[in-house]
């Protein structure tokens, strides 16, 4: 009933205020997915909010058949929303088509062909890029994502590297990655860390029966190695006791995780407390 009331009130809004109209539809769809927590097989649902792109929100299906995970940033709410609100999305697409030049101008300047890598979903630079929030719901489709898909761009100008280029250059650590997952788990939707399933990143570790992902290091037999990273400022419990506050982040392997817990990332003081 509340959703119908919102849609009725939204119809009286001016068509130029597309950001607020998309906000209601996207948040309602994401809320349904997260509350049910049983999305269809091989579906990746994500809410993408970017003030630089006119506040457009995208709800997209999974990337089960794509070798390189990408995000469609074309006009409208995407195929997932179109299947639920076909009339509303068609009307909004017509209204947004008249504003296509102003809405898509920042993306066209960057030379994009209308598709954007997966790292654009993550608020790795909230102040610089204008990202105000994101909510991700991982399913079995996320197991096929490569580690390079979660790496943000590094460098400026001609030295700017993305995806696999970052991994090949050894630039696996990023300044904003610790804040990135902290904001992800404390987003505008109040998404708890429990909803973020472990995302396998290293296939060699998967062969040994271990997952390394957003939540840290997990064992398929249900045993934790004592180095589990949480998505919030809670203290991390390790073999030596309380190590200190940490934030969940993707890691290439267990050795990098242990080394970072002992010595800290580049530019940060050590977080290991001896004794």
Curated annotation (Swiss-Prot):
One BP term from GO: DNA recombination
Whether Zinc counts among this entry's keywords is no
* The keyword Lipid biosynthesis belongs to this UniProt entry's keyword annotation: no
Biased composition annotated in UniProt, kind: Basic and acidic residues: 88-111
> Looking at the record, which segments are called Disordered?
88-120
Q: Keywords on this record?
A: DNA integration, DNA recombination, Viral genome integration, Virus entry into host cell
Protein family membership: Belongs to the 'phage' integrase family.
Record's function text: Integrase-recombinase proteins are responsible for catalyzing strand exchange between DNA molecules and play an important role in the DNA replication. May be required for the formation of concatameric complex replicative intermediates and/or their resolution before encapsidation.
According to UniProt, the name of this protein is Integrase homolog
Origin species: Frog virus 3 (isolate Goorha) (FV-3)
Record gene name: INT
């Amino acid at each position: 009933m509340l959703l119908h009331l919102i849609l009725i009130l939204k119809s009286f809004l001016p068509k130029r205020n597309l950001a607020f109209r998309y906000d209601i539809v996207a948040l309602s769809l994401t809320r349904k997915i997260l509350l049910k927590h049983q999305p269809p097989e091989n579906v990746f649902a994500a809410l993408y909010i970017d003030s630089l792109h006119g506040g457009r929100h995208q709800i997209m299906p999974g990337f089960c058949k794509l070798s390189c995970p990408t995000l469609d940033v074309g006009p409208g709410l995407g195929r997932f929303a179109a299947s639920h609100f076909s009339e509303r999305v068609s009307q909004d697409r017509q209204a947004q088509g008249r504003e296509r030049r102003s809405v898509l101008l920042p993306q066209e300047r960057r030379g994009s062909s209308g598709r954007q890598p997966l790292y654009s979903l993550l608020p790795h630079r909230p102040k610089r890029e204008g990202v105000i929030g994101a909510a991700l719901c991982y399913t079995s489709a996320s197991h096929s994502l490569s580690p390079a898909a979660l790496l943000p761009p590094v460098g400026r100008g001609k030295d700017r590297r993305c995806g696999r280029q970052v991994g090949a250059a050894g630039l696996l650590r990023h300044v904003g990655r610790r804040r990135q997952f902290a904001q992800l788990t404390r987003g505008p939707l109040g998404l708890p860390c429990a909803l973020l399933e472990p995302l396998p990143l290293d296939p060699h570790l998967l062969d040994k029966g271990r997952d390394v992902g957003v939540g840290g290091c997990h064992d398929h037999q249900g045993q934790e190695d004592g180095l589990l990273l949480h998505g919030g400022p809670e203290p991390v419990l390790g073999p030596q006791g309380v190590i200190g506050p940490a934030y969940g982040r993707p890691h290439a392997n267990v050795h990098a995780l242990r080394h970072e817990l002992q010595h800290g990332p580049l530019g940060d003081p050590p977080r290991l407390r001896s004794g």
